[in-house]
């Protein structure tokens, strides 16, 4: 029997890390690629090798925020018949074993297909701790936010380098758990370097909110994780690189490689002391 989501779990993780002067490492993978059983094993592997929070993407046929790597993973998962219901069943089975809170990344049409309240209720019952919907503007998110609040789920909103100050303020006020700072314009995917705008965006958010800020999109190497942490981010999110590893590694080697990659990223993001 699955447990209801624990309100504030994500915030408590960040508070504990802050007290230890650590930065959160947050990996992302796509559910169902290459299959749901591997997804389960990958989540457990990440959880046991340094992940502080976990992001799990529901595969969707038109993932506008995602680059080629995650789009391809979603296509493969859908071709295997992966459904949101099957993924949430998997989450319910796994969350009692996970140390790290789990955040579900989904496009809004998948929520609308079953209804906002019904989706959020089932997500909370699965034991997930948060929800991230990249294609839902905060201005249109009242119904989702209200339903999530009732169920004790965090709703994490994204801000972009191009977001004007008033929009930054609105999102900083509305988000719970943490603010997701998109490091660059465009879609997800590995980049060769961290965008110079990250430092400026972090400073703008610091002036508006005391909530943790995690940086994602385009971070794919330990060196980049180190750089983002050194700029003062509270969390480092790595997605496409994890998805690519699961897609390309030999089946008998993928979990071992994922564990090592996770440890490297966690260690790299702690190399410099963070703010007191």
Curated annotation (Swiss-Prot):
GO cellular component, as recorded: cytosol
CDD domains: Tryptophan_synthase_alpha
One Pfam assignment: Trp_syntA
The keyword Lyase appears for this protein: yes
Gene Ontology biological process terms from the UniProt entry: L-tryptophan biosynthetic process
Active site: 55 (proton acceptor), 66 (proton acceptor)
Assigned keywords, A-Z: Amino-acid biosynthesis, Aromatic amino acid biosynthesis, Lyase, Tryptophan biosynthesis
PROSITE patterns: TRP_SYNTHASE_ALPHA
Enzyme Commission (EC) number: 4.2.1.20
Annotated catalysed reactions: (1S,2R)-1-C-(indol-3-yl)glycerol 3-phosphate + L-serine = D-glyceraldehyde 3-phosphate + L-tryptophan + H2O
Subunit composition and interactions: Tetramer of two alpha and two beta chains.
Family affiliation: Belongs to the TrpA family.
HAMAP family from the UniProt entry: Trp_synth_alpha
Protein function: The alpha subunit is responsible for the aldol cleavage of indoleglycerol phosphate to indole and glyceraldehyde 3-phosphate.
Name of the molecule in the record: Tryptophan synthase alpha chain
């Amino acid at each position: 029997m699955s447990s209801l989501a624990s309100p504030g779990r994500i915030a408590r993780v960040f508070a504990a890390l802050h007290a230890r002067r650590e930065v959160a490492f947050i990996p992302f993978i796509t559910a169902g690629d290459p299959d749901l059983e591997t997804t389960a094993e990958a989540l457990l592997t990440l959880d046991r090798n340094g992940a502080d929070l976990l992001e799990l993407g529901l595969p969707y046929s038109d993932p506008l925020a995602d680059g080629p790597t995650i789009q391809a993973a979603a296509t493969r998962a859908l071709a295997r018949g992966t459904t949101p219901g099957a993924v949430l069943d998997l989450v319910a089975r796994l969350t009692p074993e996970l140390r790290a809170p789990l955040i579900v990344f989904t496009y809004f049409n998948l929520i609308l297909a079953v209804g906002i309240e019904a989706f959020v209720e089932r997500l909370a019952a699965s034991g997930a701790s948060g929800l991230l919907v990249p294609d839902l503007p905060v201005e249109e998110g009242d119904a989702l936010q209200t339903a999530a609040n009732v169920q004790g789920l965090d709703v994490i909103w994204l801000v972009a380098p191009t977001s004007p100050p008033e929009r930054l303020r609105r999102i900083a006020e509305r988000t719970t758990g943490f603010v997701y700072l998109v490091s660059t314009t465009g879609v997800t995917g590995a980049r060769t370097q961290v965008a110079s705008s990250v430092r400026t965006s972090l400073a703008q958010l610091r002036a508006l909110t005391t909530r943790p800020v995690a940086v994602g999109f385009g971070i794919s190497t330990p060196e980049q994780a180190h750089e983002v942490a050194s700029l003062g981010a509270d969390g480092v999110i790595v997605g496409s690189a994890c998805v690519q590893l699961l897609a390309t590694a030999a089946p008998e080697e993928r979990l071992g490689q994922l564990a090592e990659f996770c440890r490297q990223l966690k260690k790299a993001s702690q190399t410099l002391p963070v703010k007191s």
